[in-house]
């Protein structure tokens, strides 16, 4: 091999290595809906909530992040369904679920989850949440601890100050927001109301969540606080604060991933979830 070819080969290897090291900057495609899952709607709290159900075993509810939908959990549904009954929910106004004029709030969204469990006659379930879904999981631990077992809380915040400034300008996060708008138009029962939906939920984000140390310290539910080491949205010190404040909470930082770790490295994410849920 000539020196020129050798130099070119080394340059390509270096470029490939650099690309692999920047996985956290990628936004992999949204998974397709899981084939064979039972789907349905639950009439709860004045709206219709879409859900999927598949697998056998102890129940686990998957709660997605703001602006997205339950399809984002496709890689996790497949992995969890071997040992668990997996229920994936489109939160109110997201995906295929409807919304009404009630102001958005995490208490209301947590009450929706409890109502879906009632609809499905499931007395108790573990929660796996991402971003807003993780916040809903913590809300459930605070207000409905009798209905849940464990909470895997990925990329959550418990105070508005835990969110980084101008996160929407981050290229990966901006790409997600653009994708979410297109998916809303495709899936929503009100496909032309994305801007109104975003405005409605943004009022919640301006002031919620805002839990005190005392509230977090009252939690008795087993919780694992997890995040990617390059989260675009959540401050690392806030993630560490949550884990230190909630009694008995664990802390897990997934390497080379961001706010979208479940898409970027599903094998690592799934192993972390299963390891936590199935531990004694």
Where are these regions (language model features)?
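Conserved HGGG/HGGXW glycine-rich cap/lid loop of the alpha/beta-hydrolase fold
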Residues: 47-96
């Amino acid at each position: 091999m000539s020196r020129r070819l050798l130099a070119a080969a080394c340059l390509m290897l270096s470029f490939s290595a650099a690309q692999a090291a920047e996985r956290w900057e990628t936004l992999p495609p949204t998974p397709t809906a899981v084939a064979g899952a039972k789907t349905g709607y639950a009439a709860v709290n004045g709206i219709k909530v879409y859900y999927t159900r598949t697998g056998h075993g102890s129940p686990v509810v998957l709660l997605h992040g703001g602006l997205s939908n339950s399809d984002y959990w496709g890689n996790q549904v497949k992995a969890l369904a071997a040992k668990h009954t997996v229920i994936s929910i489109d939160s109110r106004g997201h995906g295929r679920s409807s919304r009404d004029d009630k102001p958005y709030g995490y208490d209301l969204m947590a009450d929706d989850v409890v109502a879906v469990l009632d609809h499905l006659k499931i007395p108790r379930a573990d929660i796996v949440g991402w971003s807003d879904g993780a916040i809903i999981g913590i809300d459930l631990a605070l207000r409905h601890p009798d209905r849940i077992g464990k909470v895997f809380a990925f990329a959550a915040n418990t105070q508005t100050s835990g969110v980084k400034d101008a996160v929407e300008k981050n290229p990966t996060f901006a790409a997600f927001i653009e994708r979410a708008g297109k998916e809303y138009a495709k899936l929503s029962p009100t496909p032309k109301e994305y801007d109104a939906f975003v405005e409605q939920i943004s009022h919640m984000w301006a002031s919620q969540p805002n839990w005190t140390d005392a509230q977090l310290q009252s939690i008795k539910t087993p919780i694992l606080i997890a995040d990617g080491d390059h989260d675009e949205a959540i401050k690392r010190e806030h993630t560490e604060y949550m884990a230190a404040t909630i009694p008995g909470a664990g802390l897990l930082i997934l390497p080379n991933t961001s706010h979208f770790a479940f898409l970027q490295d599903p094998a690592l994410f799934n192993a972390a979830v299963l390891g936590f849920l199935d531990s004694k």
